[in-house]
């Protein structure tokens, strides 16, 4: 069994890389979870129950991080000593800043016109852009271009926020 301090990848005996076989992650998660689930320790002493709970919590957190591609990228960068710093590093390339403004303007226009179809189309375009950017992110991470990968992660985080905003607007207009 791994240690509580091992990386999420080590916990599930997976290679430390962005490209991940999600079905292998799911299988490894079920295996580890079956070993550490607190129900297995119902008759154990308090100390063993507490340790089992720590393992179960650690396993769930690791799974959630590795299962989500954006969280996995941030985590992988943190293992490499790179802090994405999304909270205080908002500098982005000018072309992406222009794209942000266009997306925001399109959201405002479609929302003001109560045009759910336009919002749906924008969301589809955004998801397509997200797929392209995740492919680029994978290449950056695999090549060790950590600073460029960090920038790509910040951009993807912004895209996720815009997608969530569109979802909120669609929901608001549907009600």
From Swiss-Prot:
Molecular function (Gene Ontology), one example: ATPase activator activity
GO cellular component terms, A-Z: iron-sulfur cluster transfer complex
Keyword flag Protein transport: no
InterPro entries: DnaJ_domain, HscB, HscB_C_sf, HscB_oligo_C, J_dom_sf
Domain J: start-end pairs: 7-79
Keyword Kinase: no
The entry's keywords: Chaperone
Pfam families membership: HSCB_C
GO biological process assignments: [2Fe-2S] cluster assembly; protein complex oligomerization; protein folding
Similarity annotation: Belongs to the HscB family.
Protein task: Co-chaperone involved in the maturation of iron-sulfur cluster-containing proteins. Seems to help targeting proteins to be folded toward HscA.
Subunit description: Interacts with HscA and stimulates its ATPase activity.
HAMAP family (alphabetical): HscB (MF_00682)
Name this polypeptide is given: Co-chaperone protein HscB homolog
């Amino acid at each position: 069994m791994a240690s509580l301090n091992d990386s999420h990848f080590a916990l599930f005996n997976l290679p430390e890389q962005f490209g991940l076989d999600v079905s292998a992650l799911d299988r490894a998660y079920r295996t580890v979870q079956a070993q550490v689930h607190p129900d297995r320790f119902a008759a154990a002493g308090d100390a063993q129950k507490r340790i089992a709970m720590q393992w179960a919590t650690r396993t769930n957190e690791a799974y959630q991080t590795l299962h989500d591609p954006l969280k996995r990228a941030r985590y992988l960068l943190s293992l490499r000593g790179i802090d994405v710093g999304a909270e205080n590093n908002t500098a982005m390339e000018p072309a992406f800043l222009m794209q942000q403004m266009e997306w925001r303007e399109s959201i405002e226009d479609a929302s003001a016109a109560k045009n759910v179809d336009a919002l749906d189309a924008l969301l589809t375009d955004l998801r397509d852009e997200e797929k392209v950017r995740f492919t680029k992110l994978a290449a950056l991470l695999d090549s060790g271009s950590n600073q460029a990968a960090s920038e790509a992660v910040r951009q993807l985080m912004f895209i996720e926020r815009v997608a969530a905003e569109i979802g909120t607007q669609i929901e608001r207009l549907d009600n």
